[in-house]
Amino acid sequence: MAIKVIVELQAKPGKRAELKSLIESIVAKEGAGQRGFLGSTRYEVLDSPDMLVEIADWESAEARAAHMQEAAATGVYAPLSEMLAAPFRVTIIRQLA
């Protein structure tokens, strides 16, 4: 069953544009080739200038879990930590049946 992954990222002060650019670069380089990845969109948070939210669509929780295992092994997301003011928050949701 398809899922959505909501990722909330708090950039260091004044670094949201750089964080957005880095995420877009990673998605462009890694996203299209990931099995089960259907795409993602990034959003700004109107009352929090350093917050960025990404909503990603996956074919299944299993496809995302496989991707995250591979990402942990390769360190593809490691550069993000340098730009974050706090650990990112992930919420995984699926449509009610």
What is each of the regions a protein language model found here?
Residues A2-L9, G39-M68:
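Short, well-ordered beta-strand segments in beta-rich or mixed alpha/beta enzyme
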Residues I3-I6, I23-I26, I55, I92-I93:
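Weak global preference for isoleucine
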Residues A11-P13, S60, R94-A97:
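Non-catalytic surface loops within mature trypsin-like serine protease
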Residues M1-A2, A97:
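Absolute protein N-terminus
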Residues Y43-S48, E82, L96-A97:
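A short beta-turn/loop motif at secondary-structure boundaries
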Residues S25-G39, D57-T91:
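An amphipathic, aromatic/His-enriched active-site/gating alpha helix that lines ligand/cofactor pockets
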Residues K15-E18, S48, L80, I92:
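Terminal low-complexity, poorly structured segments
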Residues Q10-I23:
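Short, surface-exposed ligand-recognition loops at beta-strand->loop->(often short) alpha-helix junctions
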